[in-house]
């Protein structure tokens, strides 16, 4: 390393987050922040990239980067292989957490809640708009399984291409979407001297309770 980790820091001075300007509905604030990120974050950064955390049967957390592909009043939607490590973990423990970080805006959003599968129709609708290579890959890759080498993966893809040479691939039963139903959403805005703004929304009595947290 060319620089000490202990010396790596920056000041956050871009913006603030006050209760007076924050809506009572966290979905409204998320959409506002997401739109800001789309306008501000420079390519190749993906504003819809987020860290998804799940827990395995032994209680160990697992994190990976995924892309958010849907948002409505029910929750946050992403797609994956149901037989992958994350799919097996969600089948055993259907709870998860997401984190979005938009460094250009000095903002972070943390989301926690339960997870459900979307309908097959929703999965198929998204699958059909994916690039052909991605659709074939969903069939070819035994996600999270041990394989011998890259050549094996390429052989699996070649077999899949031959299989669907005369017809478009359909959405596999082992592939589809999940929707995270939030119970808690926290918005973090970087501020000077590490005295950051944190607004926490929690489900309560059919609505949302909003509270400020100490940084």
Swiss-Prot record:
Its cofactor is FMN. Pfam families: PNP_phzG_C, PNPOx_N. Keywords: Flavoprotein, FMN, Oxidoreductase, Pyridoxine biosynthesis. GO terms for molecular function: FMN binding; pyridoxamine phosphate oxidase activity. It comes from the Bacteria. Belongs to the pyridoxamine 5'-phosphate oxidase family. It comes from Pseudomonas aeruginosa (strain ATCC 15692 / DSM 22644 / CIP 104116 / JCM 14847 / LMG 12228 / 1C / PRS 101 / PAO1). Substrate binds at residues 9-12, 69, 126, 130, 134, 194-196. It catalyses: pyridoxamine 5'-phosphate + O2 + H2O = pyridoxal 5'-phosphate + H2O2 + NH4(+); pyridoxine 5'-phosphate + O2 = pyridoxal 5'-phosphate + H2O2. Pathway: Cofactor metabolism; pyridoxal 5'-phosphate salvage; pyridoxal 5'-phosphate from pyridoxamine 5'-phosphate: step 1/1; Cofactor metabolism; pyridoxal 5'-phosphate salvage; pyridoxal 5'-phosphate from pyridoxine 5'-phosphate: step 1/1. The keyword Cytoplasm does not apply. This is Pyridoxine/pyridoxamine 5'-phosphate oxidase. Its EC number is 1.4.3.5. Homodimer. Transmembrane segments: none annotated. InterPro entries: Pyridox_Oxase, Pyridox_Oxase_CS, Pyridox_Oxase_N, Pyridoxamine_oxidase_dimer_C, Split_barrel_FMN-bd. Catalyzes the oxidation of either pyridoxine 5'-phosphate (PNP) or pyridoxamine 5'-phosphate (PMP) into pyridoxal 5'-phosphate (PLP). PROSITE patterns: PYRIDOX_OXIDASE. FMN binds at residues 64-69, 79-80, 86, 108, 143-144, 188, 198. Binds 1 FMN per subunit.
């Amino acid at each position: 390393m060319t620089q000490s980790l202990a010396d790596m820091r920056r000041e956050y001075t871009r913006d603030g987050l006050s209760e007076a300007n924050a809506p009572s509905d966290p979905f409204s604030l998320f959409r506002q922040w997401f739109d800001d990120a789309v306008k501000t974050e420079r390519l190749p950064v993906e504003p819809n990239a987020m860290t998804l955390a799940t827990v395995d049967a032994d209680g160990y957390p697992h994190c990976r980067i995924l892309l958010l592909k849907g948002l409505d009043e029910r929750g946050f939607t992403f797609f994956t292989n149901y037989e992958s490590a994350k799919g097996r973990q969600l089948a055993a423990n259907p709870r998860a957490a997401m984190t979005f970080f938009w460094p250009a805006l000095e903002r972070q959003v943390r989301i926690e809640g339960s997870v459900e599968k979307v309908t097959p129709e929703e999965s198929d609708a998204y699958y059909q708009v994916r690039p052909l290579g991605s659709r074939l890959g969903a069939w070819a890759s035994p996600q999270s399984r041990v394989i011998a080498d890259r050549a094996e993966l390429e052989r699996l893809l070649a077999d899949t291409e031959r299989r669907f040479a005369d017809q478009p691939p359909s959405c596999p039963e082992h592939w589809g979407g999940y929707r995270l139903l939030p119970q808690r959403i926290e918005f973090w805005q970087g501020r000077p001297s590490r005295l950051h703004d944190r607004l926490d929304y929690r489900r309560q009595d059919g609505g949302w309770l909003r509270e400020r947290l100490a940084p």
